[in-house]
């Protein structure tokens, strides 16, 4: 099958198509992970994006449903140097997702690194793609909006409340689902925290009705500036009970506290990002997947920098200044402590969330 990748600057990259025979538009990004292609493809944060893998060989250990981070592939397309085995090809076909192989992924990565993320079109076809078609495909790319103009979260958030009961419940969390990864839920439940997953646009009153001990705002795709409903809800929850956030949830909390976010040139996507705890000086190797960040020049008033990225000094975590009252606790991290895929250096943060919930539950009882 033929494959073609058309970039907004007019670059045409031809290769061998695999997966579904179709055509997609999206923001072209790169991921530096050496493993975890199943988790990456099924991560809802990749909605609206075509992923280029920098590691040269994909598909060499198959596909298992237990690795899924959602109910299926959420990325728009997949770009690889080489593919091996049939399972990855069949996996993409099952979810009507195109892929292209046999291309110079180093060239693509360098281009993104120097110019920034790029609007692109990926087309696969059993028929040769002509020069005349290239012109039409490029026009589609140029007309495609920037990802910040697309409201992606409604496409990946749950449509109804889902409850995950812990076997031996120690505490309860309401998770505001902006496109949550399943491993985040799993990390909480296995620690004795029951999770009530609610839609991204749930109001304060509904969230409080579940009597949670803390709230977690999840990861998800797109620009946090589009999340006005969720930001307003988080504003209303702060001061009522502890509030935490991961990735997009971190950015939403930043805005709710009065801070600002901005779009990174090419983002952080991979399992090898070093993050420093500002207070202790400890360094964690973390898994990351984001294209926006907290503006370090406008850290919310009454808050402080908690973690920073050692590659580019971007903000990786903030917290509201310490309060003796647990209900005022607010903290969030930009990276993914659950990994999925990636290192588990920061999974202790889920222990801290659960401990926070247990303490607030006891405080409420008194």
UniProtKB/Swiss-Prot annotation:
What does the UniProt record say this protein does? Small subunit of the glutamine-dependent carbamoyl phosphate synthetase (CPSase). CPSase catalyzes the formation of carbamoyl phosphate from the ammonia moiety of glutamine, carbonate, and phosphate donated by ATP, constituting the first step of 2 biosynthetic pathways, one leading to arginine and/or urea and the other to pyrimidine nucleotides. The small subunit (glutamine amidotransferase) binds and cleaves glutamine to supply the large subunit with the substrate ammonia.
Q: Where is this region: CPSase?
A: 1-168
Which pathway does the record list?
A: Amino-acid biosynthesis; L-arginine biosynthesis; carbamoyl phosphate from bicarbonate: step 1/1; Pyrimidine metabolism; UMP biosynthesis via de novo pathway; (S)-dihydroorotate from bicarbonate: step 1/3
The record lists L-glutamine as bound by: 45, 220, 222, 248, 251, 289, 291-292
Task: Report quaternary structure and partners.
Answer: Composed of two chains; the small (or glutamine) chain promotes the hydrolysis of glutamine to ammonia, which is used by the large (or ammonia) chain to synthesize carbamoyl phosphate. Tetramer of heterodimers (alpha,beta)4.
Query: What superkingdom does the record give?
Result: Archaea
What protein is this chain from?
Carbamoyl phosphate synthase small chain
Its GO biological process annotations read: 'de novo' pyrimidine nucleobase biosynthetic process; 'de novo' UMP biosynthetic process; glutamine metabolic process; L-arginine biosynthetic process
Q: Name one GO molecular function term.
A: ATP binding
Checking NCBIfam families in the record gives: CPSaseIIsmall, PRK12838.1
Q: Which UniProt keywords apply?
A: Amino-acid biosynthesis, Arginine biosynthesis, ATP-binding, Glutamine amidotransferase, Ligase, Nucleotide-binding, Pyrimidine biosynthesis
**Where is the Glutamine amidotransferase type-1 domain positioned along the sequence?**
172-363
* EC number annotated for this UniProt entry: 6.3.5.5
